[in-house]
Amino acid sequence: MKQLKWRTVNPEETKAIAKLTAAFAKPGDVLTLEGDLGAGKTTFTKGFAEGLGITRIVNSPTFTIIKEYNDGVLPLYHMDVYRMEDESEDLGLDEYFHGQGVCLVEWAHLIEEQLPQERLQIVIKRAGDDEREITFTAVGNRYEMLCEELSRHDNISN
């Protein structure tokens, strides 16, 4: 499994990494986001949405579980599964995971059994007040190629 690591010093750098990642997004991509409360998962998602050209305000779907944004070059399905009652709760996630948009799933470890085998796992950890350590782990060929492409760009701190 290929890994990429970055250290960002402010939310704008976190968004820049997300925006670049979005530039290579394809329909059916699934990105999982892990990190403590306030680590920057929603900040990452905001940058990703900007990269897709989404103009609507992006915020955490904590109480709705899934927010759909359809005004970009690809639909974005932002999921926060932290409040799901149990892993077997049927929200039709397969339709999202194998659909025409990109899924960003916060707290994805809570629905591990429902996730596609291939995905990009993103872990965001606090490294100071505004500093973050961001780790991408590619699971599957599609995401190995995505990480390879991202590693070629030096316009973000790596």
From Swiss-Prot:
It is found in: Cytoplasm. GO terms for biological process: tRNA threonylcarbamoyladenosine modification. Mg(2+) binds at residues 42, 106. Gene3D superfamilies: P-loop containing nucleotide triphosphate hydrolases. ATP binds at residues 38-43, 130. Induction: Expressed at all stages of growth. InterPro entries: P-loop_NTPase (IPR027417), T6A_TsaE (IPR003442). One of its GO terms (molecular function) is ATP binding. The keyword rRNA-binding does not apply. GO terms for cellular component: cytoplasm. Keywords: ATP-binding, Cytoplasm, Magnesium, Metal-binding, Nucleotide-binding, tRNA processing. Pfam families: TsaE. Disruption phenotype: Cells lacking this gene exhibit significantly reduced growth in rich and minimal medium. It comes from the Bacteria. Required for the formation of a threonylcarbamoyl group on adenosine at position 37 (t(6)A37) in tRNAs that read codons beginning with adenine. Is involved in the transfer of the threonylcarbamoyl moiety of threonylcarbamoyl-AMP (TC-AMP) to the N6 group of A37, together with TsaD and TsaB; this reaction does not require ATP in vitro. TsaE seems to play an indirect role in the t(6)A biosynthesis pathway, possibly in regulating the core enzymatic function of TsaD. Displays ATPase activity in vitro, which is modulated by the oligomeric status of the protein. Monomer, homodimer or homotetramer; in equilibrium. Low salt concentration favors oligomerization, while high salt concentration favors the monomeric form. NCBIfam families: T6A_YjeE. Belongs to the TsaE family. The four proteins YwlC, TsaD, TsaB and TsaE are necessary and sufficient for tRNA(NNU) t(6)A37 threonylcarbamoyladenosine biosynthesis in vitro in B.subtilis. This is tRNA threonylcarbamoyladenosine biosynthesis protein TsaE. The lineage of its organism: Bacteria, Bacillati, Bacillota, Bacilli, Bacillales. The gene is tsaE.
